[in-house]
Amino acid sequence: MDEREALIKAGEIARQVKKEVISLIKPGTKLYDIAEFVERRIIELGGKPAFPCNLSINEIAAHYTPYKGDETVLKEGDYLKVDIGVHVDGYIADTALTFRVGMEEDDLVTAAREALENAIKVIRAGIKINEIGKAIEETIRGYGFNPIVNLSGHKIERYKLHAGISIPNIYRPADSYVLKEGDVIAIEPFATTGAGQVIEVPPALIFMYLRDRPVRMAQARRVLMHIKREYNGLPFAYRWLQGFMPEGQLKLALAQLDRVGAIYSYPILREVRGGLVAQFEHTVIVEKEGAYITT
């Protein structure tokens, strides 16, 4: 399987899982059950999770994934963002959508969805990425909402979810990277009723291996070896390690690894004023005259 075939296969799996998860999005469903279903289906369909299933409600924009024992359930009217990552041999599909639990789509959800559609329409080899930001910003503001300025899409490479280039959700002249044929990018507009910025809040439930570092604690060394071997430098969930060792030891090990820079932690991201947030995302391959949507 070559690179393009693997990217397309990962996208097909992500698309299928998005369809299947709809039946679980109803009041009373536990976030834990949704995340476990999504990640299990990815594996059953022949892929692997490229990152933990993110399930972020209302003012939480990103980086919430449930843990074992998490009793959070969906309530009617919740804005649930489901962000799914699949990889096939390291080639990644990253996609997201927003549901209003038990209710019809409203203008906030429509604004984010249309921002994604309009952004994809401008993509082709040779454009500057600020043209994507312009399409997103104009669409979201046209509905009377704010784009989240400190969240962005991203270039993707093999085993690299964020490959150094950010795809903005607003127009900035300085965003002058020119798209090349064959670039793989994730476009992910976030629309909010709030101020249009996110802040980090504890706890971190998602982590990523960065580098080997000497650590005192034997349990920390064990965790480091395990995550390096298992996840190929892609993000992993605290939930995936629950049961690997006693909970208290695991928390201490992760804290030590984070402190010495062996791992990166992803704090939960909340809209600064507590505004509601909607998100949509596709992964696309840049072509000469357009974009091939893999997801």
Swiss-Prot record:
Q: Know the name of this protein?
A: Methionine aminopeptidase
Q: How does activity depend on temperature?
A: Optimum temperature is 80-90 degrees Celsius.
Q: What's the Enzyme Commission number for this chain?
A: 3.4.11.18
Origin organism lineage: Archaea, Methanobacteriati, Methanobacteriota, Thermococci, Thermococcales
Key words of the record: Aminopeptidase, Hydrolase, Metal-binding, Protease
**InterPro entries the record matches:** Creatinase/aminopeptidase-like (IPR036005), Met_Aminopeptidase_Type2 (IPR050247), MetAP_archaeal (IPR028595), Pept_M24 (IPR000994), Pept_M24_MAP (IPR001714), Pept_M24A_MAP2 (IPR002468), Pept_M24A_MAP2_BS (IPR018349), WH-like_DNA-bd_sf (IPR036388)
The free-text function statement in the UniProt record for this protein reads: Removes the N-terminal methionine from nascent proteins. The N-terminal methionine is often cleaved when the second residue in the primary sequence is small and uncharged (Met-Ala-, Cys, Gly, Pro, Ser, Thr, or Val).
Q: Tell me the name of the encoding gene.
A: map
Annotated Gene3D superfamilies = Creatinase/methionine aminopeptidase superfamily (3.90.230.10), Winged helix-like DNA-binding domain superfamily/Winged helix DNA-binding domain (1.10.10.10)
